[in-house]
């Protein structure tokens, strides 16, 4: 299984003032790891932050599940086999704008690691941005984090 502390230290490098929270969770909304720019010392504030992050993960997982149930492929189906095969390789990624911020949800490929994660469903990466966060920077952070997490997943179960 992937180690949450290692995952958190990887994600900690990408948080900043305009990207205050990053999380990895399942499609059911179960939180695997998260990091936050703010590090409250007070126990109640830390608990409130954890509740907020879990709520975002649950909401994003639900949105992903609803989207894939109604639109299993992000591309319009064509009759050629090449296009249909390509559609299966395209992973879900979207940015949702809210009144007080943005949320990027991206699927992480777990090809070859399904047996180690005990799931065939993709992991999801959530990047929370403030209203001042640039979508392009959020997407770059998403791509880099997905690549690092995929590399980490590929080393699971291999001798060190």
Swiss-Prot record:
Keywords noted in UniProt: Cytoplasm, Nucleus
Gene Ontology CC terms, in alphabetical order: cytosol; fungal-type vacuole membrane; nucleus; Ragulator complex
SUPFAM superfamilies documented for this protein: Roadblock/LC7 domain (SSF103196)
GO molecular function: guanyl-nucleotide exchange factor activity; protein-membrane adaptor activity
Species this protein is from: Schizosaccharomyces pombe (strain 972 / ATCC 24843) (Fission yeast)
InterPro entries reported in the protein's UniProt record: LAMTOR2-like
Segments traversing the membrane: none
Keyword Nucleus: yes
The keyword Cytoplasm appears for this protein: yes
Compartments where found: Cytoplasm; Nucleus
GO biological process: cellular response to amino acid stimulus; negative regulation of TORC1 signaling; positive regulation of TOR signaling; regulation of TORC1 signaling
Protein name: Uncharacterized protein C1778.05c
């Amino acid at each position: 299984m992937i180690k949450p502390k290692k995952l958190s230290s990887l994600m900690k490098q990408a948080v900043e003032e305009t990207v205050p929270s990053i999380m990895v969770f399942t499609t059911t909304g179960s939180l695997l790891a998260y990091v936050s720019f703010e590090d409250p010392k007070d126990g109640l504030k830390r608990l409130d932050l954890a509740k907020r992050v879990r709520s975002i993960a649950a909401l994003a997982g639900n949105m992903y599940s609803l989207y894939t149930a109604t639109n299993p492929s992000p591309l319009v189906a064509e009759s050629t086999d090449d296009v249909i095969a390509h559609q299966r390789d395209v992973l879900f990624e979207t940015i949702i704008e809210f009144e007080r911020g943005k949320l990027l949800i991206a699927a992480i490929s777990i090809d070859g690691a399904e047996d180690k994660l005990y799931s065939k469903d993709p992991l999801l990466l959530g990047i929370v941005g403030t209203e001042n966060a640039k979508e392009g920077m959020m997407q770059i952070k998403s791509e880099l984090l997905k690549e690092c997490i995929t590399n980490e997943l590929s080393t699971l179960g291999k001798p060190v």
